[in-house]
């Protein structure tokens, strides 16, 4: 009986997503879209945009960093929301 209960517990853990991980885009500027799973219970994705001598630059990733004046940042909370 204990073995059956242990087996059911293991199957439940394997079948359920107990550790949900947010997925964010992480490509830079106009590169081919790629994604990454965020670690440490991160709940935000970001898209940061600024202009330099090469034109507009874009950075994407996990989190919601603080930025300096002149840098546009958009933070969001759903999978792949920062494209």
UniProtKB/Swiss-Prot annotation:
The record marks 54, 57 as: May be critical for toxicity. The keyword tRNA processing does not apply. The keyword Isomerase does not apply. Changing residue 68 to Q: Decrease in the rate of isomerization reaction of disulfide bonds. Residues 1-21 form the signal peptide. It holds the Pfam family Toxin_cobra-type. Changing residue 68 to E: Decrease in the rate of isomerization reaction of disulfide bonds. GO terms for molecular function: acetylcholine receptor inhibitor activity; ion channel regulator activity; toxin activity. Transmembrane segments: none annotated. PROSITE patterns: SNAKE_TOXIN (PS00272). It comes from the Eukaryota. It is found in: Secreted. Disulfide bonds join 24-45, 38-62, 64-75, 76-81. Expressed by the venom gland. Binds to muscle nicotinic acetylcholine receptor (nAChR) and inhibit acetylcholine from binding to the receptor, thereby impairing neuromuscular transmission. Has a higher toxicity than cobrotoxin-b. In vivo, when tested on rat arthritis models, shows anti-inflammation and immunosuppression effects. Belongs to the three-finger toxin family. Short-chain subfamily. Type I alpha-neurotoxin sub-subfamily. This is Cobrotoxin.
